[in-house]
Amino acid sequence: MSEVAEKVKKIVVEHLGVDEAKVTPEASFIDDLGADSLDTVELVMAFEEAFGVEIPEDAAEKIGTVKDAIDYIEKKKAE
């Protein structure tokens, strides 16, 4: 697992209070991990702070799974 993936997983566990085993790449923040819309906004803000990237609102709306977050952050960091 990449450094970005590990960090994303840690942030999700901390913010949503879910079991680490549930935080798989395919896990949906809302459907699988019980997040609501406010939780997803807070997660995006935490990702921005942790990785030093900006995630515009239109991109944030497309981040629905753990893998979506990892892929987006890795892409932004590579720019």
From Swiss-Prot:
It is found in: Cytoplasm. Pfam families: PP-binding (PF00550). It comes from the Bacteria. The keyword Heme does not apply. Keywords: Cytoplasm, Fatty acid biosynthesis, Fatty acid metabolism, Lipid biosynthesis, Lipid metabolism, Phosphopantetheine, Phosphoprotein. One of its GO terms (biological process) is lipid A biosynthetic process. GO terms for molecular function: acyl binding; acyl carrier activity; phosphopantetheine binding. The keyword Lipid metabolism applies. One of its GO terms (cellular component) is membrane. Pathway: Lipid metabolism; fatty acid biosynthesis. Residues 2-77 form the Carrier domain. 4'-phosphopantetheine is transferred from CoA to a specific serine of apo-ACP by AcpS. This modification is essential for activity because fatty acids are bound in thioester linkage to the sulfhydryl of the prosthetic group. The modification O-(pantetheine 4'-phosphoryl)serine is found at S37. Belongs to the acyl carrier protein (ACP) family. PANTHER family: ACYL CARRIER PROTEIN, CARRIER DOMAIN-CONTAINING PROTEIN. HAMAP family: Acyl_carrier (MF_01217). Carrier of the growing fatty acid chain in fatty acid biosynthesis. This is Acyl carrier protein. It comes from Acidiphilium cryptum (strain JF-5). The gene is acpP.
